[in-house]
């Protein structure tokens, strides 16, 4: 009799599990991207690809971008720049700023497509409009040097500033450099300080130089040395050289 009860209970539990499995929702597009990232961390590129493909089909731009990166780098698939462009394009069309920037890189470098700096600048522009910080920095550089777009220093600075506000340290450094050239040292210090806070050793080194030379601030050798040390620890050769010149060990 007891055996029958156990069998009955086991049967009910199995049915319950089946019911629960049936009620569980399929992962949505963003969840699929997260699952794909977890698979990448485990080096399971086949499973990651499956998750990203599904996410891309569900119009999650970031999933398309990951697929593009797989094809560009040959991770879990054969290297195929044409497919990379296809998926980056879809990601960009779905308003993923990262995808627009990576697509811009391929056009700028002529990888899988004819080299086209003008078209690259258009993709960088969309990337920046979508608040992708690195897209703003690269677009700023194109305006700074007049590559693929007319030279416009004011626009370049505005783009560097936007990138810096979005916490891209190269944007902060480039803005600081432009302020330094214009002898607006106080503004340069603000940008270099932010780059240093973002743990970019180049920003720390530049800030140290200004503190040591009393540019836009009172001379502060002690703080300058601290910033040279931060720069040197980040493998900035100039910062290490400055410490050697001052006969200070790291």
Swiss-Prot record:
* Signal peptide per UniProt: 1-25
- Keyword rRNA-binding in the entry? The reply is no
| Gene Ontology biological process terms in this record | response to antibiotic
Q: Which domain of life is it from?
A: Bacteria
Per the UniProt entry, the disulfide pairs are 56-64, 92-100, 128-136, 164-172, 196-204, 232-240
The EC number(s) given in the record are 3.5.2.6
- Describe activation and inhibition of this protein: Inhibited by cloxacillin and oxacillin but not by ACA derivatives or metal chelators.
Q: What is a GO molecular function of this protein?
A: beta-lactamase activity
Q: Start-end of the TPR repeats?
A: 29-62, 67-98, 100-133, 134-169, 170-202
Which of UniProt's keywords are assigned here? Antibiotic resistance, Disulfide bond, Hydrolase, Repeat, Secreted, Signal, TPR repeat
Question: Cellular component terms, GO, for this chain's entry?
Answer: extracellular region
The record's family statement is:
Belongs to the hcp beta-lactamase family.
Q: What is this protein called?
A: Beta-lactamase HcpA
